[in-house]
A protein has these predicted regions:
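Extracytoplasmic loops and strand-loop junctions of Gram-negative outer membrane beta-barrel proteins
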Residues: 1-2, 54-60, 112-120, 131, ...
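Membrane-proximal, glycine/serine-rich, low-complexity loop/turn segments characteristic
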Residues: 1-102, 121-161, 197-219
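Outer-membrane beta-barrel transmembrane domain signature of Gram-negative proteins
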Residues: 179-229
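Flexible, surface-exposed loop regions and adjacent strand-edge segments
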Residues: 44-53, 103-112, 164-173, 225-229
Length: 229
């Protein structure tokens, strides 16, 4: 058996940071990007010897894989007055990858070409995720009494698209077999949560906390399969 393989990979990245401080406002942000691209070629030869019969399978293939990832987030704090503070924290994530492959295979028996198979495929995936948090808090006394309203929100979606095509030709009986398939998957959803927190100070450095929370989630998914000759 003999297998040779060679490939080339390229990588790239980028990062940006920003910081601002004003009298009552603080702002922080960060953006990060990472991407890769790999190209790979392969060749395989398999020799099988059984009694007086000999069979050889030869195949060549090419694969390419690309990935892209991006993350961006920020932080904002605004001291509206001496006892009231607003905080906002958003984040965004996205990712995408593409895979492409193709191959050609021949089967030989006793130096006679028996079959040929040509196949190709693609696979694309993409997704994103968004989250946001906002909190408004207010101090009601110097002893630790305070109240806060916090809202969280999130949204996400992803999709997958796969396609596989193959054609096999059998020379002995001169027939052909075709197999084609496409698969699609889609998922999306969102959620949010609202919280109201009240803190009451007690003697001897103890605190009593009251919390009300409401949360909602919704998700949807679809799956499709297509086959044709």
């Amino acid at each position: 058996n003999l297998r040779t393989q060679k490939g080339l990979t390229t990588s790239r990245s980028l990062g940006i940071n920003a910081t601002y401080d004003w009298q009552r406002v603080k702002f922080r942000s960060n953006i990060q990007y990472v991407g890769t691209d790999r190209l790979e070629d392969s060749r395989t030869t398999i020799d099988n010897f059984l009694r007086q019969d000999k069979s050889i399978t030869q195949s060549t293939g090419r694969n390419r894989l690309k990935n892209d990832n991006l993350i961006a987030n920020a932080f904002l704090e605004w001291k509206m007055d001496s006892v009231t503070t607003l905080i906002f924290r958003p984040q965004y994530r996205t990712a995408a990858n593409d895979r492409r492959n193709g191959s050609f295979q021949q089967g030989w028996g006793n130096d006679v070409l028996l079959n040929e198979k040509e196949s190709s495929g693609t696979n694309h995936n993409s997704s994103y995720n968004v989250t946001m948090m906002m909190q408004l808090s207010r101090k009601l006394s110097r002893m630790g009494r305070n109240i806060a309203l916090k809202v969280d929100y999130g949204s996400n979606a992803s999709s997958t698209d796969r396609k596989n095509l193959s054609t096999t030709h059998y020379f002995k009986n001169n027939t052909e077999k075709v197999q084609n398939q496409k698969i699609e998957d889609e998922i999306d959803g969102y959620n949010y949560r609202v919280q109201l927190v009240y803190v009451e100070p007690l003697p001897w450095l103890h605190f009593l906390q009251f919390r009300y929370s409401y949360q909602y989630r919704a998700n949807n998914s679809d799956h499709f399969v297509y086959n044709w000759d």
